[in-house]
Regions:
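Long alpha-helical, hydrophobic tracts
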Residues: 1-6, 32, 56-65
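Negatively charged, low-complexity tracts enriched in Asp/Glu with abundant Ser/Thr
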Residues: 1-24, 75-123, 128-130
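Surface-exposed polar/charged interaction patches
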Residues: 5-8, 72, 95, 108-111, ...
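Short aromatic-glycine-(Arg/Gly/Cys) micro-motifs in beta-strand/loop hairpins
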Residues: 23-54, 72, 128-139
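A short, exposed loop/beta-hairpin motif centered on an aromatic-Gly-Thr core
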Residues: 50-63, 140-145
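Long, terminal "pre-/pro-" and other extracytoplasmic accessory regions
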Residues: 55, 63-74, 79, 177
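A short, charged, amphipathic alpha-helix used as a generic interaction element across diverse proteins
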Residues: 60-73, 150-161
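A eukaryote-biased signal for long
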Residues: 125-211
Length: 211
């Protein structure tokens, strides 16, 4: 199973499969849905917030649609942040202990998760800019020109997320046969966007569609 039984609710609403959290039995305001299109045999995966729908993926493969839906749902619902450690990071910086604050972060992860002061597209990258910091992943900013306190906490939080989804990807790769690359899964979870393979102009991102 991609999700544990107590992690989610799964219901059929108006002909669509709806995945949502909490114990509510009424129609949720925020959810992920899979809609089977009878006209073209495609499955459409969408993220819905208060009736605003963002289409994340269109595919003819049922299993691929299910995997996309699960990753999007986990991105919305998972709470994996260690708030006590984030507080410790801030306290170190408040006392001028920048190196200790950084060690408090990197000691939690191996170096496949992060890079310091240079950008690696497949890692969470902390880049110094004077007394400010940028945090990037996949060529995109997670935080730009923020204070070190803010930058370090964002850096730590996203390292946690990347470590978590990397482990999840390895787990589902062992259980399932699917076509999504590691980069696609990681970017979908971290950035919330579907990623195509590179095309002739080098673009790999497909914009979400609002409905």
């Amino acid at each position: 199973m991609l999700l544990q039984g107590d992690e989610y609710n799964l219901k059929e609403l108006n002909g669509r499969i709806v995945l949502f959290g909490g114990n509510s039995t009424i129609y949720p305001e925020e959810y992920v849905e899979i809609d089977k299109q009878n006209t073209n045999d495609k499955f459409i995966v969408a993220e819905v917030h208060r009736d605003i729908k963002q289409i994340k993926k269109e595919t003819e493969k049922r299993e691929e649609a299910a995997i996309y839906a699960v990753i999007i749902y986990k991105r919305l619902s998972d709470n994996i942040i260690n708030r006590m450690r984030a507080r410790d990071i801030r306290e170190c910086l408040n006392h001028g202990e920048e190196e200790k604050a950084l060690n408090c972060i990197v000691d939690c992860f191996d170096n496949s998760i992060y890079s310091i002061d240079y950008e690696d597209r497949m890692k969470i990258s902390l880049i110094y800019a004077g007394d400010k910091a940028d945090v990037k992943f996949g060529g995109e900013y997670l935080a730009e020109n923020v204070t070190l306190s803010r930058g370090y906490v964002v850096f730590y939080n996203y390292c946690e997320k990347l470590q978590y989804i990397s482990s999840f990807y390895n787990e589902i790769q062992e259980k399932l046969n699917f076509d999504m690359s590691r980069e696609q899964v990681l970017r979908l979870y971290i950035l919330g966007r579907y990623v195509k393979e590179p095309n002739d102009n080098g673009s790999i991102c497909e914009n979400d569609k609002n409905v």
